[in-house]
């Protein structure tokens, strides 16, 4: 009884403290208390529920039977919207706080919400090497199932809660993208419900214009109801090499060289300052040296970016064997390095051993409990951006990031961008090697002002024919946005499919004014 009594006393004291200080004060100044006592246990309950649900649904093979009925229900909702006069635009009914993006869309309150309850894996076809999934299937679900049967996605984006729909309608990337491209480039078919309630399937050879226009469109051409994605044979481990590199010129040269080597299954860099980085290259393998096995996904292990930093501090190269699923979700426990700002002692060994099994808190729950004051503070004093620029511009880009926002660590992830129709493609007619530069954290540039600094960064990205990931704050005006993205095919299909009265334009969903 004593532990229960102690816990009850602590909870009572905490509630009294909240009453005296005010909930907003606690959420802003001692947010870690709220996160540790409430959000971590709640996140664990969410994870257990969704894991058990997905396992039961797949084992009973009920998802394919239910899928057709759910799609018909979506079509019915769209047709009812038309019969009622199509008075407002449509959007998905999923609450904005459930998404992984930093902001919540204001349009959810004014648009017609179409409920889309599609969160299951429908089929794994190992002969055709295809997995067919619904749009709300998460990367955590995908890895749990596929790796257990010896398969994986060629590109498997990092965070557990990222959904297939978000990765298609937005975008997704991983350290294998230098071989396979973005997430959209491993998809072979999309199934959608259009503005008139009709159902359509599109592939590179069937309804190809729609197939190439869907990625990055943020649900403004139709409602995604299923996708077919390539799968490849998996191996048990990733043989990962760590190489610290000093000097910006050497970093850029080494990273470019490793990104061009197709024998590397994975390439990633963590930049800890403008002239200090660790470059990691990996290959999948079934063989392991037991003395070099590192199960980095175990809850008591150090956060991955801190583990990598040790190679830089000691200026030594390293070789480790990491279980494949642990590698895929190596940044999940620390949400890259964002969790250090929420739970400052989160990487402390004592905290990891006692509470690490509950980490991380759900990003959706962090958003839900953010509050307006904290949201404004984050906007002015926190940056979460992914900018995609040609690899040949890497050195120039890193100088620009240093001058405009000065955030470290910086994530470096290469990808090949094919010359295909759609919103995003290289400037020329051939595939080109690009790099995702991810900046997440508190800017250390003097007199940082979010709007002016980010507009300066966006201007640079446009000037080198780069792209901004659309989950992040976008300060561009409409003209600048369409200078960055190729809207020719997109606008043609919007008119052809009757989307102009059914869905907002993509800019109106992602611009700063559309989110809070």
Curated annotation (Swiss-Prot):
Record's signal peptide: 1-22
Enzyme class, UniProt record, top EC level: oxidoreductase
Gene Ontology biological-process annotations: cholesterol biosynthetic process; skin development; tissue development
Q: Which GO terms describe its molecular function?
A: Delta24(24-1) sterol reductase activity; Delta24-sterol reductase activity; enzyme binding; FAD binding; peptide antigen binding
Annotated localization? Endoplasmic reticulum membrane; Golgi apparatus membrane
All copies of the FAD-binding PCMH-type domain together span 58-234
User: Its catalytic activity?
Assistant: cholesterol + NADP(+) = desmosterol + NADPH + H(+); lanosterol + NADPH + H(+) = 24,25-dihydrolanosterol + NADP(+); 5alpha-cholest-8-en-3beta-ol + NADP(+) = zymosterol + NADPH + H(+)
- Give residue ranges on the Lumenal side: 23-31
Question: What membrane topology was assigned to this protein in its record?
Answer: Single-pass membrane protein
User: Per UniProt, which keywords does this protein have?
Assistant: Cholesterol biosynthesis, Cholesterol metabolism, Endoplasmic reticulum, FAD, Flavoprotein, Golgi apparatus, Lipid biosynthesis, Lipid metabolism, Membrane, NADP, Oxidoreductase, Signal, Steroid biosynthesis, Steroid metabolism, Sterol biosynthesis, Sterol metabolism, Transmembrane, Transmembrane helix
Q: What is its main location?
A: endoplasmic reticulum
**Do the record's keywords include Oxidoreductase?**
yes
Q: What EC number(s) does its UniProt record assign? A: 1.3.1.72
Q: What is the required cofactor set for this protein? A: FAD
Q: Which GO terms describe its cellular component?
A: endoplasmic reticulum; endoplasmic reticulum membrane; Golgi membrane; nucleus
Annotated site location: Cleavage = 122-123, 383-384
Q: Where does FAD bind?
A: 163-175
- Which regions span the lipid bilayer? 32-52
What is its pathway? Answer: Steroid biosynthesis; cholesterol biosynthesis
Record text on subunit structure and interactions: Interacts with DHCR7; this interaction regulates DHCR7 activity.
Name the family: Belongs to the FAD-binding oxidoreductase/transferase type 4 family.
**Stated role:** Catalyzes the reduction of the delta-24 double bond of sterol intermediates during cholesterol biosynthesis. In addition to its cholesterol-synthesizing activity, can protect cells from oxidative stress by reducing caspase 3 activity during apoptosis induced by oxidative stress. Also protects against amyloid-beta peptide-induced apoptosis.
Q: Give the protein name, as stated in the record.
A: Delta(24)-sterol reductase
């Amino acid at each position: 009884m004593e532990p229960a009594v102690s816990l009850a006393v602590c909870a009572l004291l905490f509630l009294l403290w909240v009453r005296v200080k005010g909930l907003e004060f606690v959420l802003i100044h001692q947010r870690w208390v709220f996160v540790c006592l409430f959000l971590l246990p709640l996140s664990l309950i969410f994870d257990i529920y969704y894991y058990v649900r997905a396992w039961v649904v797949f084992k009973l093979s009920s998802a394919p039977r239910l899928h057709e009925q759910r799609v018909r229900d979506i079509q019915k909702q769209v047709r009812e919207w038309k019969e009622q006069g199509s008075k407002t635009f449509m959007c998905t009914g999923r609450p904005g706080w459930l998404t992984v993006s930093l902001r919540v869309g204001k349009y959810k309150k004014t648009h017609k919400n179409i409920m889309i309850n599609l969160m299951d894996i429908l089929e794994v076809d190992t002969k055709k090497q295809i997995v067919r999934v619904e749009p709300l299937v998460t990367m955590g679900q995908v890895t749990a199932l596929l790796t257990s049967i010896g398969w994986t996605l060629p590109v498997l984006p990092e965070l557990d809660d990222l959904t297939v729909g978000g990765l298609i309608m937005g975008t997704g990337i991983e350290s294998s993208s230098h071989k396979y491209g973005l997430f959209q480039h491993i998809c072979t078919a999309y199934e959608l419900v259009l503005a008139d309630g009709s159902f359509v399937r599109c592939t590179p050879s069937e309804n190809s214009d729609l197939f190439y226009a869907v990625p990055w469109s943020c649900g403004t051409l139709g409602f995604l109801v299923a996708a077919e994605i390539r799968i490849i044979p998996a191996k048990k481990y990733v043989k990962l090499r760590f190489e610290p590199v000093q000097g910006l010129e050497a970093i850029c040269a080494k990273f470019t060289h490793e990104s061009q080597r197709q024998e590397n299954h994975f390439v990633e860099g963590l930049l800890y300052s403008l002239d200090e980085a660790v470059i990691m290259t990996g290959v999948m393998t079934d063989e392991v040296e037991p003395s070099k096995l590192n199960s980095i996904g175990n809850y008591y292990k150090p956060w991955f970016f801190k583990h990598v930093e040790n190679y830089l501090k000691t200026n030594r190269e390293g070789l480790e064997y990491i279980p494949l699923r642990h590698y895929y979700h190596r940044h999940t426990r620390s949400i890259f390095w964002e969790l250090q700002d929420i739970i400052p002692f989160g990487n402390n060994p004592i905290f990891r051993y006692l509470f690490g099994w509950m980490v991380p808190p759900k990003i959706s729950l962090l958003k839900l409990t953010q509050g307006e004051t904290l949201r404004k503070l984050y906007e002015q004093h926190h940056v979460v951006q992914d900018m995609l620029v040609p690899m040949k511009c890497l050195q120039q880009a890193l100088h620009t990031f240093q001058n405009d926002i000065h955030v470290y660590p910086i994530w470096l992830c290469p990808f090949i961008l094919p010359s295909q129709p759609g919103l995003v493609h290289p400037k020329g007619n051939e595939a080109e090697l690009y790099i995702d530069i991810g900046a997440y954290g508190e800017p250390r540039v003097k007199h940082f002002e979010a709007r002016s600094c980010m507009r300066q960064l966006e201007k640079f990205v446009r000037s080198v024919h780069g792209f901004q990931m659309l989950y992040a704050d976008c300060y561009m005006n409409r003209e600048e946005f369409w200078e960055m993205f190729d809207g020719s095919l997109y606008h043609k299909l919007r008119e052809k499919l009757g989307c102009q009265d059914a869905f907002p334009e993509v800019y109106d969903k992602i611009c700063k004014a559309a989110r809070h």
